[in-house]
Curated annotation (Swiss-Prot):
The lineage of its organism: Bacteria, Pseudomonadati, Pseudomonadota, Gammaproteobacteria, Enterobacterales. The keyword Ion transport does not apply. It comes from Sodalis glossinidius (strain morsitans). This is DNA replication and repair protein RecF. ATP binds at residues 30-37. One of its GO terms (cellular component) is cytoplasm. SUPFAM superfamilies: P-loop containing nucleoside triphosphate hydrolases (SSF52540). The RecF protein is involved in DNA metabolism; it is required for DNA replication and normal SOS inducibility. RecF binds preferentially to single-stranded, linear DNA. It also seems to bind ATP.
Length: 364
């Protein structure tokens, strides 16, 4: 699975671009602020419905333009399969249109299913040293792509938690919350089971990849479901009613889950250098993408912003070798071509990005 064509209009500093892409490596080279990260962000937005550098859609629309428009052509990877066209537009009011094979009315979740991707950026350390929400997102990405019913259950869980938290400000007795909890409890248990199963299933892939990237450390991974593992969730909600009512939110549950990583028994953020943390982050993203391939035959797109950041030559070469071994489509940004010489790829393409204009510089 790969993007064979990408069209961008009025996204960030890019007025218009129409790119024919390589199925292997695509390199984006340009000075800081040139727009190379904007290309990565356009691809990410096409697959997620949102940008990774801003949660406000208006900020990614080019100055004085009413909307951005993104189009892509997805090749399935075999000769007999039909290509899929996808599109996303959004105006300054936040109204979106998702188009698949020429028809409107689709949901962003459908784009995410068609374009599984892994993002590695200089800000991606939050996966390791940020709050639990970043590691929940890591687990939920895997559940979303491996369990068809997950997204609906997850959406319903969010809705019920929001309603329950609003009700906590108004009720005086737990019995008044039962209408929400009767639906919430089975959803919470189901989502927790999916997360636990996924975390256990991917553990071997993560361990093997981390052993290549950080052989000097013994790493341990543990899933924490968000409430006491000895407690029944329904009983816990009733027991903690007064506490939740005082807080005006639900203090325990799958929305508090975490996926903890330790090195030699110590949280990785306390013992690893920034370069080692980046390698670990890359290992996690690669392991997750490869697990998807092993499980159902689908390949991710890998988006890597500022490839050389935090990595010496040896580590860049190791990352390049592992990326090539995935046989997936990879997009890499760098300030100069020197920073990506460790990624020789005879089938790749190199694009020069300058002030929002993108041109094919060479076939690698």
């Amino acid at each position: 699975m790969a993007l064979s064509r990408l069209m961008i209009r009025d996204f960030r500093n890019i007025s218009v671009a129409d790119l024919s892409l390589a199925a292997d490596f695509n390199f984006l080279v340009g000075a800081n602020g040139s727009g190379k990260t904007s290309v990565l962000e356009a691809i990410y937005t096409l697959g997620h419905g949102r940008a990774f550098r801003s949660l406000q859609s208006g900020r990614v629309i080019r100055h004085e333009q009413p909307e951005f428009v993104l189009h892509g052509r997805i090749e399935a990877g075999n000769v007999d399969a039909r290509a899929t066209s996808v599109g996303l537009s959004r105006n300054r009011l936040g109204d979106s249109t998702v188009r698949i094979d020429g028809s409107d009315g689709h949901k962003v979740a459908e784009l995410a299913q068609l374009l599984p991707m892994q993002l590695i950026t200089p800000e991606g350390f939050t996966l390791l040293n940020g709050g639990p929400k970043y590691r929940r997102a890591f687990m939920d990405w895997g559940c979303f792509h491996n369990e068809p019913a997950f997204f609906t259950a997850w959406s319903n869980l969010r809705r019920l938690l929001k309603q329950r938290n609003a009700a906590l400000r108004q009720v005086s007795r737990y019995q008044q919350l039962r209408v929400w909890d009767q639906e919430l409890i089975p959803l919470a248990n189901r989502i927790s089971e999916w997360r636990a199963d996924y975390s256990a299933a991917i553990a071997a892939d993560i361990t093997a990849t981390c052993a290549q990237f950080l052989p000097e450390f013994r790493l341990d991974f543990s899933f924490q479901r968000g409430w006491d593992k000895e407690s029944d969730f329904g009983e816990l909600l009733e027991r903690q009613f007064e506490r939740d009512r005082a807080l005006t939110y639900t203090a325990s549950g799958p929305h508090k889950a975490d996926f903890r990583i330790r090195a030699e028994g110590v949280p990785v953020e306390d013992i690893l250098s920034r370069g080692q943390l980046k390698l670990l982050m890359c290992a996690l993203r690669l392991a997750q993408g490869e697990f998807l391939t092993h499980r159902n035959g689908r390949r991710c797109l890998y988006l890597i912003d500022d490839f050389a950041s935090e990595l010496d030559t040896g580590r860049r070469r190791l990352l390049a070798e592992r990326l090539k071994a995935t046989h997936a489509q990879v997009f890499v940004s760098a300030v100069s071509a020197d920073q990506i010489r460790d990624i020789p790829d005879e089938k790749g393409k190199m694009f020069k990005v300058e002030q929002g204009k993108i041109s094919l510089q060479s076939e690698v």
